[in-house]
Amino acid sequence: MSSPARLAVILGPTASGKSALAIALAAKLNGEVVVCDSTQVYRRFNIGTAKVPPAGQKGIPHWMMDLVEPHEIFTAGDYRRRAEEILRDIHARGRLPIVTAGTGLYLRALLEGLADAPTRSEELRARLRERSAGRGPEYLHRLLRRLDPGSAARIAPRDTQKIIRAIEMRVLTKKSVNEIHAAGRAPLEGFTPIKIGLKPPRPALYARIEQRVEEMLAAGWQEEIRAILSTGVSRDAKPFTFIGYREILAQAPVGEGLKTLPLSGPSLPAATINEIRKSTRHFAKRQQTWFARESNVHWLPTFGDDPLAIERSVAFLR
């Protein structure tokens, strides 16, 4: 029987340099990058999801991006099935798969598997949406906090789709999402994950977040949103709930078309830009909380583009 293949896993909060480290390692170790991010599976939503553009990939193949249209549903189980095929193909070609993990649930699905969850209940979902109407966008999150505090701590208050799914699972099974996922998993076979975690100092991370928001706006984030909407994509599409997209889109109220959507970063209200920064910082904290529970991680107290991080990661993987 052949020994398990190496699987590099780079995890850490947004703006910590996971992609930079993965690309550097791929160049040194004959690898390919497998993105593990629930926002990057959607086509056309590029700037605000921090997809590495083709020029930035430096010739390194990147997988598991641009998989579905904005209106399509894509689950952690879908990710597991498709990513596992990619991992095995990369290994079969004699190359090292390098996973860049920003979405903890997707990483759990890939490495540990997910238990059989209850099927969707459209009746329950309709009741939840009806109850939340007129009570504000965070009503369902407050409800989830009472039913399943652990899930509420991991899910953003405005991520309605994930909140409804967590409530649905709790109501239908009488168990928390963690309890459901802990039972009946099918771990990934044939690979030995080598986890490398990025944990830069918080002040430095927050400074990078602020810088990246500015860079995204300068790169044409608003123009991207305008272009997506002009193709007929609904404002209700899930990717428009992602950080930054929802704040920018709020500048073009329903019924007023796109004429009120600011054309460039400087024309956005300062309060909107600050809200994007704040939401991103909160997201980074949630990611850190999730990844802190991961076992057997080689933690590096720096960013992924730090030469020391690259040097130490190569040593871990050889």
Residue spans for each PLM region:
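Phosphate/pyrophosphate-binding catalytic cores of soluble transferases and nucleic-acid-acting enzymes
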Residues: M1-R318
